[in-house]
Regions:
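Active-site beta-strand/loop signature of hydrolases that rely on acidic residues for catalysis
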Residues: 6-7, 22-40, 105, 134-157
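Structured beta-strand-rich core segments of catalytic domains in phosphoester-bond hydrolases
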Residues: 36, 42-115
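A short acidic, glycine-rich active-site loop
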Residues: 167-178
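Surface-exposed cleft-lining segments at the edges of enzyme active sites
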Residues: 81-86, 110-128, 166-169
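N-terminal, active-site-proximal structural segment of metallo-dependent hydrolase catalytic domains
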Residues: 1-53, 60-65, 174
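Short aromatic-enriched loop/helix-cap "lid" or pocket-rim segments at secondary-structure transitions
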Residues: 42-44, 157-162
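Conserved small/polar residues in nucleotide/adenosyl-binding loops
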Residues: 186
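Active-site-proximal beta-strand elements of phosphoester/diester hydrolases
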Residues: 1-10, 102-117, 148
Length: 186
């Protein structure tokens, strides 16, 4: 199964390119981030016209994630499970998960977290704790799973041109990096 992740930074602006990529046959499942459109504006019909299925968790102007595939998309879940009462107030469309061709796939648009420190950084770390919890639950199910997308983290020096230029940025912050590795490795 070939799975591709793409932060489209506005599906409306990139729809032609996304449709062309789907038609190219280079992937079996396409995970999109930063759709910048509400669920009701998602172009399901355009994808269906080329034989692709789609599921989205959209949000007007900001965020938004989707799963596209020529295979059936089943058991769709929108949003991460809540761990605390505060999590219930999370109205940002940053996570969608479904079963595609025997794989459990999640499309992730992790919060940026800037400015750091501050409420946006706190939200990022809380969101990453929820992601870690969900990843652990998926691993416990012992089914093939892929959580792909835009993690908004630079885990290693090789992931940026000049680490010193990112000092103080949430993408390079040690807490972000530690949470990233915790989510994926443990």
């Amino acid at each position: 199964m070939r799975i591709t992740c793409w932060n489209v930074n506005s599906l409306k602006a990139r729809l032609g390119h996304v449709l062309d990529y789907c038609r190219s046959g280079q992937t079996d499942c396409l995970l999109l981030q930063e759709l910048k459109l509400a669920d009701e504006a998602f172009p399901h019909d355009e994808f269906a016209a080329i034989g692709w299925n789609s599921a989205c968790h959209g949000q007007k102007t900001y965020n938004g994630v989707a799963i596209l595939s020529p295979h059936d998309i089943n058991d769709v879940t929108k949003g991460l499970p809540c761990l605390t009462e505060d999590d219930k107030a999370d109205d940002q469309s940053r996570y969608i998960e479904a079963t595609v061709a025997g794989f459990r796939v999640g499309s992730i648009y992790l919060p940026n977290g800037n400015p750091c420190p501050g409420p946006k950084f706190d939200y990022k770390l809380a969101w990453m704790r929820r992601l870690h919890s969900r990843a652990q639950a998926l691993f416990a199910e012992e089914i093939p799973a892929v959580l792909g997308g835009d993690y908004n983290v630079m885990p290693q020096e090789i992931d940026c041109y000049d680490p010193s230029a990112w000092a103080g940025d949430a993408l390079w912050h040690m807490d972000s990096r530690a949470a990233f590795f915790l989510s994926l490795i443990h």
